[in-house]
Design a protein with these regions (language model features):
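Beta/alpha (TIM)-barrel catalytic core signal, keyed to glycine-rich beta->alpha loops juxtaposed to Asp/Glu
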Residues: 150-354, 364-378, 404
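Conserved, mostly hydrophobic/aromatic
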Residues: 38, 50, 78, 104, ...
């Protein structure tokens, strides 16, 4: 596989940006939204999408307000990977009045058990969870049915050769899903899936920090030691470059997650580049990858939608990420939580991603803000309940020392 230098990556990005901007039209609020074909699906998606993950911690009122703001700008694609029945209900209530205007990317294999998210390939549970998704989203079909979260080639091979993929095909044949997709963090899995011809859409984590790293082959080996970073590391990882090219060449629509790296790229102190990026710069980086169709950004309030949609009218200077990439270190994200939630389920019922989020918010301040402490104390289970079993660490795609962070959070918050 070909290896690119930073200079080549930046030059390619500049050319690609000019090409797609010249070809995109738009409507929506103030006529600013841009749209792209979603691979060969026949669907056109807004380049700014709605990753609804953060609605889980928000009220129905906020969820509806964010959804209406998205609609006002012409955002037309939403991702719902979450299995929590409460967030599914909130999202369903918000999108139901304008269901036909939304392209729903829903996940099969994301289930709810004993009050927690759990990923599974057990078909009876998957079928029950999918029926729940349809009911709570108040719809009789999902536009893009995603095979939820596969990060090893071995698991992909098992799924593609077994009853799970057959179930996905049955859903498509019945019209309950219109297209089959896959979500993964591992470019090797993405490459295998795209080459198989079995998927039409790929949801993949794309940002400048992740793109310089080698692929994940299995969670426990992610970033295991400095030997993962050789002297040649510095441009985009060749596996990722190949994946993006394959998506473009074969018409597999690339829907982007983690464009902001969980918000860490906005903070100079926490960013691996030691320089803060803006939402516009992160979005521009993602959308200049070959095959990229939409960035599924996360929002906590309507103003976050405004910040993302500003991309559509941003100047070249506002979109410029090259000056940051030119100063990028060789490696970036070893041991840093992006609040993705893949560590679940916790044997003690702790919402690990939320505890980590609140902990990071708290330690960034001279003292714990009252609002952060209030949110923490309102959680059903606290970091002090951690038993250090470390089962969560085996599921973490970023090799975070979760047990140690739980101890630190318990000490900081007092429970």
């Amino acid at each position: 596989m070909e290896k690119f230098t930073r200079r080549e990556v930046l030059a390619t990005a500049t050319l690609a940006a000019g090409a797609w901007v010249a070809g995109c039209g738009g409507n929506g609020r103030n006529g600013k939204m841009l749209y792209r074909p979603l691979g060969k699906t026949g669907l056109d998606v807004s380049v700014i999408g709605f990753g609804a993950e953060w609605m889980e911690r928000n009220t129905q009122e906020t969820c509806t307000a964010v959804t209406r703001r998205c609609e006002s700008y012409g955002i037309n694609i939403v991702d719902c990977w979450m299995s929590n029945p409460e967030v599914r209900t909130k999202l369903g209530n918000a999108i139901a009045p304008n269901r036909r205007n939304w392209i729903i990317q829903g996940h099969v294999g994301s289930t709810w058990k004993d009050g927690q998210y759990e990923r599974t390939r057990d078909l009876p549970r998957c079928k029950e969870a999918f029926a729940d998704l349809l009911a709570r989203l108040q719809t009789d079909y999902i536009d893009i049915g995603m095979i939820h979260y596969i990060d090893t080639v071995e698991e992909w091979n098992t799924v593609v050769q077994g009853p799970f993929l057959q179930y996905m095909k049955e859903l498509k044949a019945s019209g309950k899903i219109r297209h089959i997709g896959l979500s993964t963090h591992n470019p090797l899995v993405g490459i295998a899936a795209v080459k198989s011809g079995e998927i039409e859409v790929l949801m993949f984590s794309v940002n400048p920090a992740y793109d310089i790293l080698p692929p994940i082959e299995e969670f426990m080996s992610y970033y295991k030691g400095d030997e993962r970073y050789d002297a040649k590391l510095g441009g985009i990882a060749p596996e990722r470059a190949e994946l993006y090219r394959l998506c473009e060449e074969r018409g597999v629509g690339l829907t982007v997650m983690k464009a902001y790296a969980g918000g860490r790229l906005f903070d100079a102190e926490r960013s691996p580049f030691k320089t803060a990026l803006t939402p516009v710069q992160c979005i521009h980086y993602a959308l200049t990858r070959p095959g990229a169709c939409t960035v599924l950004a996360g929002y906590d309030k309507p103003e976050h939608v405004d910040a993302a949609v500003h991309y559509c009218e941003a100047s070249a200077a506002e979109r410029d990420y090259a000056s940051v990439l030119a100063k990028a270190p060789r490696h970036a994200y070893d041991g840093q939580c992006t609040y993705c939630g893949h560590c679940a389920p916790c044997t003690s019922g702790i919402d690990i991603a939320m505890v980590n989020k609140l902990y990071d918010l708290a330690v960034a301040q001279p003292s714990v803000p009252d609002s952060v402490r209030k949110h923490y104390l309102a959680l059903k289970h606290h970091a002090g309940e951690c038993t250090s079993c470390k089962r969560c660490e085996s599921r973490c795609p970023f090799h975070v020392g979760i047990a140690a962070r739980m101890q630190a959070a318990a000490k900081l918050f007092g429970c």
